[in-house]
UniProtKB/Swiss-Prot annotation:
GO terms for molecular function: cytoskeletal protein binding; metal ion binding. This is Cytoskeleton bundling-enhancing antitoxin CbeA. The gene is cbeA. Keywords: Cytoplasm, Magnesium, Metal-binding, Toxin-antitoxin system. It comes from Escherichia coli (strain K12). The keyword Cytoplasm applies. Binds 1 Mg(2+) ion per subunit.
């Protein structure tokens, strides 16, 4: 994962490239289309992208949290909470990040969007 993060602190809205992840209006946002093989997920760097400007701390947290998020999504595939035949968005939280994921009823892919968890205002 870390080989996909260089330059995340440089402005790049990626409007000239396809967005592979789950549709997301929050910026910054990391999006990816993961390949599903049974209950396993595979990350392909050419099917991922970043919109907006991640802080160095958030980019570091994304690098740390991504393997954990992948494992949690695989467990959700195993339990049936994430189902390739039914559209259903799941939300995970790790290291100050929010991850939304959904199969979008596609039998071979899981789409995700990861972004810094917004702070709650009192």
């Amino acid at each position: 994962m870390s080989d996909t993060l260089p330059g995340t602190t440089l402005p790049d809205d990626n409007h000239d490239r396809p967005w592979w992840g789950l549709p997301c209006t929050v910026t910054p946002c990391f999006g990816a289309r993961l390949v599903q093989e049974g209950n396993r997920l595979h990350y392909l760097a050419d099917r991922a992208g970043i919109r907006g400007l991640f802080s160095d701390a958030d980019a570091y947290h994304l690098d740390q949290a991504f393997p954990l998020l992948m494992k949690q999504l695989e467990l959700m595939l195993t339990s049936g909470e994430l189902n390739p035949r039914h559209q259903h968005t799941v939300t995970l939280y790790a290291k100050g990040l929010t991850c939304k994921a959904d199969t979008l009823s596609s039998c071979d892919y899981v789409y995700l969007a990861v972004y810094p968890t917004p702070e709650m205002k009192n």
